A protein has these predicted regions:
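Residues at secondary-structure transition points
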Residues: 8, 12, 55-59, 63
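Conserved hydrophobic/aromatic packing and binding residues within compact polymer-binding modules
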Residues: 17, 31-32, 42-45
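A short, Lys/Arg-rich alpha-helix, primarily the initiator
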Residues: 1-26
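Helix-turn-helix/homeodomain-like alpha-helical modules used for DNA recognition
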Residues: 82-85
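DNA major-groove recognition helix of helix-turn-helix/homeodomain DNA-binding modules
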Residues: 59-77
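Recognition helix of helix-turn-helix/homeodomain-like DNA-binding domains
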Residues: 36-60
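Short alpha-helical "recognition helix" segments of helix-turn-helix
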Residues: 27-35
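The alpha-helix within a helix-turn-helix
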Residues: 21, 32, 69
Length: 85
């Protein structure tokens, strides 16, 4: 089952991502790589601490991603699979 949570600010995003990171075995912290902005979709890749950086992606801090999303007039939803069926 998919769970969607509307993200209002950076603090809430960090909290939700930490829950997600911990459930996948990552340590606290991490980076977000903004990959693409398209209509209704902003794609980004989340990496744990010390990600391999091949120099081809630009790293954005979470607050920068939030600012970009709000500037473009989007709402941000974090969608994740819920293991409970």
């Amino acid at each position: 089952m998919r769970k969607a949570t509307e993200i209002i600010d950076e603090r809430q995003l960090v909290s939700e991502l930490h829950i997600n990171w911990k459930s996948r075995g990552y340590t606290d912290g991490g980076m977000a790589d903004l990959l693409e902005i398209a209509p209704k979709t902003i794609s980004y890749k989340l990496s744990g601490i010390n990600p391999d950086n091949n120099g081809k992606k630009t790293h954005f801090k979470l607050n920068e991603i939030i600012q970009i999303i709000h500037y473009l007039g989007f709402k941000l939803y974090l969608v994740r699979e819920d293991d409970a069926k």
